[in-house]
Amino acid sequence: MTQSRTHTCNELRLEHVGQKVKIVGWMENVREVGNNFAFVVVRDFYGTTQVVIEDEAMMAIIKGINKESTISVEGTVRERASKNPKQATGDIEVVPEKIQVLGKCRYNELPFEINRSREADETQRLKYRYLDLRNPAVKQNIILRCNVISALRQAMTEHGFLEITTPILTASSPEGARDYLVPARKHPGKFYALPQAPQQFKQLLMTSGFDRYFQIAPCFRDEDARGDRSPGEFYQLDMEMAFADQEDVFAVLEDVLPPIFAKYGTYNIASSAPFTRIPYREAMEKYGSDKPDLRIDLIVQDMTALVQGVDFAPFAEGNLVKAVVVSDCALTRKNIDKLCADVEVQSGNKPYWFRLDENGELVGGVAKFLAERKEALIEALGLKPGCLVGIAAGKKEAAQKTAGVMRKMLGAAVPGHMDKERYEFCWIVDFPMYEIGEESGELEFCHNPFSMPSGGLEVLLKAERGEIDPLTITADQYDLVCNGVELSSGAVRNHDPEIMIKAFEMVRLGEEDVKKKFPAMYNAFCYGAPPHAGIAPGVDRMVMLLSGEESIREVIPFPMNKNAQDIMMGAPSTVEQKQLDELHIAIVGETEE
């Protein structure tokens, strides 16, 4: 039995008419239209070809084959009497002389129709992912992923970066999300960890004398799933540059990403260099988010002073009150109430609203509380008849978050306020170095503890002496955002042991703590480290944006479900007692069935 083919199922055209050919693939569909007459669709990776059955012998073979069996068809190409312009091979058909089963589908019924698998329950899709991926619409996302990764590799290589792989088994990190731990058989009671990111290794590469590093890095974090985050593992374009600063990192990605987004994206327009830069505090004030979608033309305004003294509890003294003004808003009361309910679900805080009608009166929502402030509101907020004003009130963080969610939803819901068909990048810069911890009530690192503080050692010493508030210290850290999705965080690294120790002392950790938690990196920096900077855009999120998908699972070949389970492979699973004994592990407490 030979499985070689002369052509793929997307290759045959009118110029092949009269030729003897052999095609192979899955039997997608059979349509019987009379005695000993049927149309068969054969599908392979590349496309589909119609096979026409016209004799009893061939019909007998086809009737004995279940759909989704793999077959080979040898026959002659002829021109179709009735052509299908929607199909690449729609001008021809193959008249078979021999049909052979290569791999039998043993089931008469499939879990779902292959070409309609996206309509099936997600659990079924994940359980039978190998069938789901036969759907060309599903497969296309994985092909896109491959093309994007290939383009990223080529672009990074052209920019002088070396692709270097870093260890998968490493030490547990005391920072960030939960680690996936791997017991060390030869070292009872000790564990490796799967890396949450190659952070320390890539910085050590810079200290080792490499100049530009990248890899498509697998990262492992034991964290909950959400629409733009898959549990378990994810991949990122990890990069680091020696003797570099923020501007060097920006220059590389501003050159690499726009052409890839324009070529492979659902939209063929991507912002060009330089990307818009927004300081963190400005982003929170103006957009209510540190990952703003700049395709939306709405901004957040402060109306706290305008409602001071208004007899409405959410506007009470001590609360911030934020407004999102939407011009030419034709949303109905029902639409607005539904949108406000959705905002509350996402933000955890109830929003409010009012409208300026065509007669110049405040109506709807909380308008009755604001009647006496009408003129001041119109002037300060720039209101015109037809404007809807969404309101967020509460403590600073709650008010900003609610306003940000409202801005995003109103921008998408009201026509004319969102240029949807483009990719709009921006950098969020000047993140705070420190914050007051919600639980501890004390100074803590806000984001990455290894970022260089803006101003270096001098600014830390000033804070230590009480000359400045440590909460005003910013870090040389930056986020890359596209269409409201955070693609990556990056930073200029703190490569100086003296500055590093001082930064940690600000949060009540000293030199011994740093040496204990990060021994390799600290010791390496003591041997002369170059200034270096890097970033790591998420590959899965990039492909999700490019494909237009709302769930990141649609762009991963074999994703886990929301509960971090691979229901196709049955992972996680129990293991034999012998394996546990070898690892010196005892299961304590109840186990999941």
Task: Specify the residue positions occupied by each region the protein language model found.
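Class II aminoacyl-tRNA synthetase catalytic cores and aaRS-like
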Residues: M1-E593
